[in-house]
Amino acid sequence: MNANNLLQAAIFIVVLIAAAVPVARYLTRVMDGSSAVVRVFGPLERALYRLAGIDPLTEMSWKQYALATVAFNALGVLFLYALLRVQGWLPGNPQGFGPMTVDGALNTAVSFVTNTNWQDYTPEQTVSYLAQMLGLTVQNFLSAATGIVVVLALIRGFARHTAQTIGNFWVDVTRVTLYVLVPMAAIIAALLMSQGVIQNTKAYQDVPTLQTTSYAAPRLDAQGNPVKDAKGNPVTVQTSVKAQTLAMGPVASQEAIKMLGTNGGGFFNGNSSHPYENPTPFSNFLEIFAILIIPAALCLVFGNTIGDRRQGVAVLAAMTVALAAAIGIETSAEQGGTPVLASLNVDQAASPLQAGGNMEGKETRFGIAQTGLFVVATTAASCGAVDAMHDSLTPVGGLVPMLLMQLGEVIFGGVGSGLYGMLVFALLAVFVAGLMIGRTPEYVGKKIESYEMKMVSIVVLLTPLLVLVGTSIAVLADAGRAGIANPGPHGFSEILYAFSSAANNNGSAFGGLSVNTPFYNWMTAIAMWFGRFGTIVPVLAIAGSLAAKKRIAATSGTLPTHGPLFVVLLLGTVLLVGALTYMPALALGPGVEHLMLFVGAH
């Protein structure tokens, strides 16, 4: 960790927190209807309600809200699945791509609807422009809006008292999409285009290369997976290349909401390491900023809405401290290089002539500082976009993003999902504190009783169950082990990372695992769906229960939840639950792999 790395991280955090304040103010006014933007575009909003037959003045109970949420997203899965299956017969397909397989289309549909954007295919070789724009990009907006409205419903649960409703799902989704996501995405898309991100609907361009390139390429089967011989080694074929095909497409418009909505699915297989998605250091900084700005602002929206800004600041402070620590560990691990190369007297020190450290799988235009920022931001949030190959990170460098996902992505987290996950941990923290001092736990004026803790338990335990059971099945099943390209602890890490990513709706991956198979498509689809809606429904149940409670006044015995002590308690709860749940699995994967580096060095 050198001065350059520290300075870049510090500048980013300062810019993020400074920008979160006005964005939070705007979000608060949009959702309560007091914003001038809502008044100006009110006729359009009301026209949409009339067209859909919605009464915007009728609010919903938590059960109605949950039913609308699940039904809306289930219809999204069906529509996107159908679109991917028939894309070969639709216009907007200049490359003539055929339909996806049944399991591949279902996996992709579930992936984008759940805000995961897990991609086990090569987008520029699989998905047509129409499917990208009408299917994937639309779901990038709607899945992000779903996460935001769920946390807004939970915030209303804290803010209201003796109420039977928590808002109207259709009104919330419309306002978030129309007034927040669309204008912010348009601004980010314009900035990305100014940096060189492409936006067109041209057919792919064939250009001659400067010289003929010959190489041994792996032979692929019909599903795009490497073919292996009887000994398990990849079968290769000699290939010569005299021309290069440059993929085109409407990239900037999808890239903007991909980052802003913490979606993460790339237009290209290289994701944000591809120069057409992320060409410059400024575009990289902008994309990292876009990932975290709404999650950061929502913390302050929480404080604004419940009438105590200190509560939102405390949650934001806990997230920021954890983010800064993760950036420090990640960047230090990558900047430090590997003991194996050090034993061979390879110079890994940063200098004016080299970035130093572990540059494998990284883009030289970003270096270790911006790559470390991106790795942490994309896994602290439920984004999953990458500007470097996570499979090439050092063992400790790979452990950091894996653990951030396994903690529930509550360090900022996805748009909406991060804050409602952290508020669930806040309820758990005050419950534990209440047990220690023998008092009924309270949080922001609401008593936390057995019903809320049952729902909290479901949220906290469900995703670890999906991750660990899914990993166990994949390790034991022949179909699961067949996808491992790197046997040993790293192969185990790849499977653990895959299910951590799917169940926590992240979408990033260690690239050494071949997952475009029926086994992994079905397994990860199940993990993604229940990881998303298996937590959303209990969160809405908590919102409904809290809204019905009376607000109680703070007394001398009430635990203050706005100071440094609570920040420490909250972080301790998050880390303790994560450590107890995942430490054995992490020891078998990244832990063993890290120790093997020192064995190899000697």
From Swiss-Prot:
Source domain of life: Bacteria
Topological type in the membrane: Multi-pass membrane protein
Pfam families (alphabetical): KdpA (PF03814)
Subcellular location: Cell inner membrane
UniProt KW keywords: Cell inner membrane, Cell membrane, Ion transport, Membrane, Potassium, Potassium transport, Transmembrane, Transmembrane helix, Transport
InterPro entries registered for this protein in UniProt: KdpA (IPR004623)
Main location: membrane
Annotated transmembrane regions: 3-23, 64-84, 135-155, 178-198, 282-302, 313-333, 418-438, 456-476, 522-542, 565-585
GO terms, molecular function: P-type potassium transmembrane transporter activity; potassium ion binding
Record text on subunit structure and interactions: The system is composed of three essential subunits: KdpA, KdpB and KdpC.
HAMAP family registered for this protein in UniProt: KdpA
Protein name, UniProt field: Potassium-transporting ATPase potassium-binding subunit
Lineage, top ranks: Bacteria, Pseudomonadati, Pseudomonadota, Betaproteobacteria, Burkholderiales
